[in-house]
Design a protein with these regions (language model features):
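Hydrophobic membrane-targeting and insertion signals
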Residues: 1-2
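The alpha/beta-hydrolase serine catalytic core
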Residues: 129-208
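Serine-dependent carboxylesterase/thioesterase catalytic core
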Residues: 73-161
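Active-site catalytic motif of lipid deacylating hydrolases and related acyltransferases
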Residues: 5-90, 170-199, 203
Length: 210
């Protein structure tokens, strides 16, 4: 007899790691997972690390676009599959740094108009509107600012209308990646989310929406 399908979790976390981190959810992502598990209590949680390169090749716009597109496609497929196969499961979407860009773009209602026509065939289509009903919360940790994105030649992230009220953006005050500073290397503050209380804040935001 075939093995029975795995039980659907109460909560499905789809999380994209930050730039240059090894496969998995990354260090900040793991701190967020731990905070979420601590607050969920008896609820079951499954963690899906988004499968994408998380490339640090910011100077190569084509390569950077490819890594983000790979992440958007993989994360979107997991969210849609969960909605189809486990309709009662609450999906939580999130990411850190470059991973937050991936997660943010997954919510987009339309492909950014800044995308050159020759690249459109490679861009994943936005998720169907009804998928938003299955997504309880979106937590974006240290998402690069609009200024940062423009400076590297990428379109800024626009959260889809169906996700705006369920999205939390976390940015430490001195984090130059997300606070609107000109593009440059990350400041010390970019790596303190695991200890500055913000992952707990993100977990609490999720709990309010389950």
């Amino acid at each position: 007899m075939p093995a029975p399908p795995p039980a659907c979790p109460d909560v499905q976390l789809v999380f994209a790691r930050g730039t240059g981190e090894p496969p998995g959810v990354g260090g900040i992502g793991q701190a967020y997972v731990d905070a979420l598990r601590a607050q969920l209590g008896p609820k079951t949680l499954d963690v899906y690390p988004v499968n994408y390169p998380a490339s640090s090749a910011f100077g190569d716009r084509i390569q950077f676009a490819r890594t983000v597109i790979d992440g958007i496609r993989d994360a979107g497929m997991k969210v849609e599959a969960t909605a189809a196969n486990c309709p009662d499961t609450k999906v939580v979407l999130g990411g850190f740094s470059q991973g937050a860009v991936v997660a943010g773009f997954v919510t987009a209602a339309e492909i950014p108009e800044q995308i050159p026509p020759e690249y459109l065939e490679f861009i994943p289509k936005p998720m169907p509107d009804e998928i938003a009903e299955h997504v309880a919360a979106v937590v974006l940790i240290a998402m690069p600012s609009d200024r940062f994105m423009r400076d590297i030649g990428a379109p800024p992230v626009v959260i889809g209308p169906s996700y705006v009220e369920k999205t939390l953006k976390l940015c430490a005050p001195d984090d130059t990646i997300c606070n609107g500073a000109p593009v440059g290397g990350p400041s010390f503050a970019h790596n303190v989310y695991g200890v500055n209380g913000m992952v707990g804040e993100g977990a609490a935001f999720v709990m309010q929406r389950l």
